A protein has these predicted regions:
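Short amphipathic alpha-helical segments embedded in low-complexity Lys/Glu-rich regions
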Residues: 39-40, 113, 172, 202-207
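Short capping/connector residues at structural and topological boundaries
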Residues: 48, 87-88, 147-148, 153, ...
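Hydrophobic/aromatic-lined pockets within catalytic cores
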Residues: 74-78, 101, 138, 159, ...
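Membrane interface segments of multi-pass transport proteins and intramembrane proteases
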Residues: 83, 172-176
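GST superfamily/GST-like fold recognition
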Residues: 103, 145-169, 177-183
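Non-globular targeting/processing and membrane-anchoring segments
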Residues: 122, 131-132, 159-164, 185-224
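Surface-exposed helix-capping loop/turn segments at secondary-structure junctions
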Residues: 135-146, 168-169, 193-199
Length: 224
């Protein structure tokens, strides 16, 4: 089939889940760092519709969109299964993965870095979503049980990404006291060696987010 290449950025929460999956599966791959301000011709060639990371190239196969890539990885490399065996449990995991990408991820940035009424509304939405996930993880080490699974990889960004964006933006969203089970899960997840390997250095990541905040706010301020 050929080698495996991952076009990604170190900061992308969607790229991280693919790195984690490949690591857990023991798949050797080439990490190709993309600059989203100056996208490479190969990235635009492989993902001409969305023009974004991550992109997985496996021989002649090109796969885009992180949840689709995770499914491809699961079906191609059988070692360390990520999805549950039971069909209902698999469907449930996929439901919460979609919930994460559609309901939780979009408002988090505004909740942590926004201002005024928009920030308050976004924070309310995020807290509602986190409360639902808190119920799902109660009494469990991981969403996948005793081992890291598909849903842990999808939600893994919560364990480090939110706190870094909170620090950069100055707004607290994820309080350990409000979501103790989710907080403990995050600690279990982030301190797993294979997971920790793919997390960007804290100081550099916070600096990256701070720059992004300044850039986005400057664009908003200059809008007519």
């Amino acid at each position: 089939m050929g080698g495996v290449k991952l076009f990604a950025t170190k900061e992308s929460l969607f790229s991280a889940r693919i790195q984690w999956a490949l690591k857990l599966k023991g798949v050797e791959y080439e990490f190709i760092l993309e600059d989203l301000a100056n996208k490479s011709p190969l990235l635009l060639k492989y993902n001409p519709i969305y023009k974004k990371v991550p992109v997985l190239v496996h021989g002649d196969n090109v796969i885009v969109e992180s949840l689709v890539i995770l499914e491809y990885i699961e079906e191609t490399w059988k070692e360390h299964p990520l999805l549950p065996r039971d069909s209902y449990d698999r469907a449930t995991a996929r439901f919460w993965a979609k919930f994460n990408d559609e309901k939780l991820v979009p408002p988090v940035w505004t909740a942590c870095t926004g201002e005024g009424e928009a920030q308050e509304k976004a924070k309310e939405s995020v807290l509602e979503s986190l409360a639902l996930l808190e119920k799902q993880i109660e009494g469990k080490k991981f969403f996948g049980g005793e081992q890291i699974g598909y849903l842990d990889l999808v939600l893994g960004w919560i364990s480090y990404w939110i706190s870094a964006v909170e620090e950069a933006g100055g707004n607290k969203v994820l309080e350990a006291e409000m979501f103790p089970s989710l907080h403990q899960w995050g600690q279990n997840f982030i301190h797993t060696p294979l997971i920790e390997e793919c997390i960007p250095a804290r100081e550099a990541f916070v600096a990256y987010v701070q720059y992004a905040i300044i850039y986005i706010r400057s664009i908003s301020a200059n809008k007519p």
